[in-house]
Amino acid sequence: MKSVLLLTTLLVPAHLVAAWSNNYAVDCPQHCDSSECKSSPRCKRTVLDDCGCCRVCAAGRGETCYRTVSGMDGMKCGPGLRCQPSNGEDPFGEEFGICKDCPYGTFGMDCRETCNCQSGICDRGTGKCLKFPFFQYSVTKSSNRFVSLTEHDMASGDGNIVREEVVKENAAGSPVMRKWLNPR
């Protein structure tokens, strides 16, 4: 009798683990039927429920989310966001979190996808590669423009090279250049 009880105790958790998916879906139908879904929600963003059948409202950045609740509006984070646990519980004892942006280099639902862009920066929702033209050098400009010609050349901050001779000439004629303020 003890062996039957022990076997039952060991098999029940194994059965429950097999029933739960990575998405924590509960009571999912064998086949999705869109007629079983609630009417289409009117919200800013929607995501598929944990079963992958029906669209539900998604929580936005900074809003409360639940990782283990399925089929309820506003409980899952939208694309490009993930549910960051906040070590708190609601009145029912369910753990909740706050929707936060995906870390750089990841995108999609729950930030599961990896960005394959050359720059490593992609849209957190879609994964589309982002380009920042103000960080890219123009191809038509001379490549030696950004190289210092001598070891005493300086930069003025506007992309122009300031030679040591020019600084010495300005310092000799300008009384302002002779007086330096002590740093605080």
Swiss-Prot record:
<keyword id="KW-0037">Angiogenesis</keyword>
<dbReference type="GO" id="GO:0062023">
    <property type="term" value="C:collagen-containing extracellular matrix"/>
</dbReference>
<dbReference type="GO" id="GO:0008284">
    <property type="term" value="P:positive regulation of cell population proliferation"/>
</dbReference>
<dbReference type="Pfam" id="PF00219">
    <property type="entry name" value="IGFBP"/>
</dbReference>
<keyword id="KW-0732">Signal</keyword>
<feature type="signal peptide">
    <location>
        <begin position="1"/>
        <end position="19"/>
    </location>
</feature>
<feature type="disulfide bond">
    <location>
        <begin position="77"/>
        <end position="99"/>
    </location>
</feature>
<dbReference type="InterPro" id="IPR009030">
    <property type="entry name" value="Growth_fac_rcpt_cys_sf"/>
</dbReference>
<feature type="disulfide bond">
    <location>
        <begin position="43"/>
        <end position="57"/>
    </location>
</feature>
<dbReference type="GO" id="GO:1902204">
    <property type="term" value="P:positive regulation of hepatocyte growth factor receptor signaling pathway"/>
</dbReference>
<keyword id="KW-0964">Secreted</keyword>
<comment type="subunit">
    <text>Monomer.</text>
</comment>
<keyword id="KW-0325">Glycoprotein</keyword>
<keyword id="KW-1015">Disulfide bond</keyword>
<dbReference type="GO" id="GO:0005576">
    <property type="term" value="C:extracellular region"/>
</dbReference>
<feature type="disulfide bond">
    <location>
        <begin position="37"/>
        <end position="54"/>
    </location>
</feature>
<comment type="function">
    <text>Involved in angiogenesis; promotes angiogenic sprouting. May have potent implications in lung endothelial cell-leukocyte interactions.</text>
</comment>
<dbReference type="GO" id="GO:0005178">
    <property type="term" value="F:integrin binding"/>
</dbReference>
<feature type="glycosylation site" description="O-linked (Xyl...) (chondroitin sulfate) serine">
    <location>
        <position position="156"/>
    </location>
</feature>
<protein>
    <recommendedName>
        <fullName>Endothelial cell-specific molecule 1</fullName>
    </recommendedName>
</protein>
<dbReference type="InterPro" id="IPR038850">
    <property type="entry name" value="ESM1"/>
</dbReference>
<dbReference type="GO" id="GO:0031012">
    <property type="term" value="C:extracellular matrix"/>
</dbReference>
<feature type="disulfide bond">
    <location>
        <begin position="28"/>
        <end position="51"/>
    </location>
</feature>
<keyword id="KW-0654">Proteoglycan</keyword>
<dbReference type="GO" id="GO:0005201">
    <property type="term" value="F:extracellular matrix structural constituent"/>
</dbReference>
<dbReference type="GO" id="GO:0005171">
    <property type="term" value="F:hepatocyte growth factor receptor binding"/>
</dbReference>
<feature type="disulfide bond">
    <location>
        <begin position="65"/>
        <end position="83"/>
    </location>
</feature>
<dbReference type="GO" id="GO:0002040">
    <property type="term" value="P:sprouting angiogenesis"/>
</dbReference>
<dbReference type="InterPro" id="IPR000867">
    <property type="entry name" value="IGFBP-like"/>
</dbReference>
<feature type="domain" description="IGFBP N-terminal">
    <location>
        <begin position="24"/>
        <end position="102"/>
    </location>
</feature>
<dbReference type="GO" id="GO:0001525">
    <property type="term" value="P:angiogenesis"/>
</dbReference>
<feature type="disulfide bond">
    <location>
        <begin position="32"/>
        <end position="53"/>
    </location>
</feature>
